[in-house]
Amino acid sequence: MKSTSFALMLAMLAAPAFANPDVGGAPMFETKNIIENAVNSADHTTLVAAVKAAGLVDALMGPGPFTVFAPVNAAFDALPPGTVETLLKPENKATLTKILTAHVVAGDFTAADIAAKAKASKDGYFNMKTLSGDALSAKVKNGKVYVFDESGNAAVITIADVDQSNGVIHVINKVLLPK
């Protein structure tokens, strides 16, 4: 039964979509890059402000491909009070850059790719190296794809496979933190 459920989940994740999902109330276009789409999402205003403050706009407009695990505003709001404001200060640019690039993996990995690689591994996890040099791992539990940072904190992919001209975005519900 587990194999059938997993196969069904993979089939649903891999099913071709005729259009990208809307994110944050805005359409996402496959012909636009990560930044061009993200700036239109009402759910990612904090992330976009952080990317600008870290000076990562040009990098994320580059050819990629990139897989971005994009935390929603509520994920940043869940951090301890004052954290975001402190990170956005110019003197904290290096720390902010490290945190943000810990959400970006080189390559274009769909949720089905991630799930299949996790399922095929001996330990059930797909291990990824981020642009910051940190590690993320992903596992499928109860039909959902979870992404873990190096401390074991988990985020759930809430909107998968938002195709971009230079990669893919997966919306997540938590901020992943490097060690």
What are these regions (language model features)?
Residues M1-A19:
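Gram-negative bacterial Sec-dependent N-terminal signal peptides
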Residues F6, F18-K179:
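Mature, structured domains of secreted/extracytosolic soluble proteins
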